[in-house]
From Swiss-Prot:
Name of encoding gene: glk
Top-rank taxon, per record: Bacteria
Alphabetized CDD domains for the sequence: ASKHA_NBD_GLK (cd24008)
GO cellular component: cytosol
Pfam families documented for this protein: Glucokinase
Matches recorded under HAMAP family: Glucokinase (MF_00524)
Lineage of the organism: Bacteria, Pseudomonadati, Pseudomonadota, Alphaproteobacteria, Hyphomicrobiales
Localization annotation: Cytoplasm
The protein, known as: Glucokinase
Keyword NADP: no
Amino acid sequence: MQAIIDAEQSFKFPVLVGDIGGTNARFSILVDSNAEPKEFPVLQTADYATIDEAIQHAILDQTAIQPRSVILAVAGPVDGDEIDLTNCDWVVRPKKMIADLGFEDVTVLNDFEAQALAVVSLEGHHMEQIGGKPEEAVATRVVLGPGTGLGVAGLFRTRHAWVPVPGEGGHIDIGPRTERDYQIFPHIERIEGRVTGEQILSGRGLRNLYLGICAADKITPTLETPVDITSAGLDGSNPQAAETLDLFATYLGRLAGDLALIFMAHGGVYLSGGIPVRILSALKAGSFRATFEDKAPHKAIMRDIPVRVITYQLAALTGLSAFARTPSRFEVSTEGRRWRMRR
């Protein structure tokens, strides 16, 4: 008789690692602990009804390699045997994956837990720094990622290992501070009466902010998508779009600074996700760093804390791969998040 159990031990190769976001899913396979990852094309989650179907058709059917272990990073909290994804209709069912796809071992982490693992695994040329001093080697770090949603995680060092701290920080309250903020915020869409970080600092948040600016200025919106708004803001062809990017950078700087204070992140704040890379020039323009540092009475501390934009699209896979290769380098709790077939 076969039974599925939790297990705390190293991973059996080959290992399939996957980063499952609200819009895109990325996968690679590690044949062994020393091999370079075998990468696969980025998938659109909307193109497949289930994650099992996506893995079968886009991964397993395209290679002769049969993974024994799987490590997935998913957008949303990991709780129970059926894991719903935030901003995506997929449901991860590890027991079903083991039964149907031939895996022996499935581990599911939070997507920004994987991003946290990545910040101490990426090479320097995969990041671009915005202000601050060089990071302190073993100091606490924070990862903040506006994309389809808004992800947040911390990373701290014990005596022997790095410990990622996942959470749902994208759903904290965010509020007005300046006179202009007070003009715009009444027009921002609320969730049960709240304006959350994700309602502004995400793809849809970018559009919410643009519509709020247009409403405050009594101007009919002419741009439909976050991509349109970003393009028009970067080239300066639309004043409201340009202000959208400036305020997006401002609010992102405020939140990043708050998180840096909470964690006292002398190891740096790391911006991941698709949006920071696309608007890098806007983040460098000044308002982001200025509001990041504007944290009296601790402005001197904030001036020293570096911010780095992760420019590598496969950062989460890098973090998961590092965990698969050298799990002893990290302290990752897999209780209730790892399923294994015992034969």
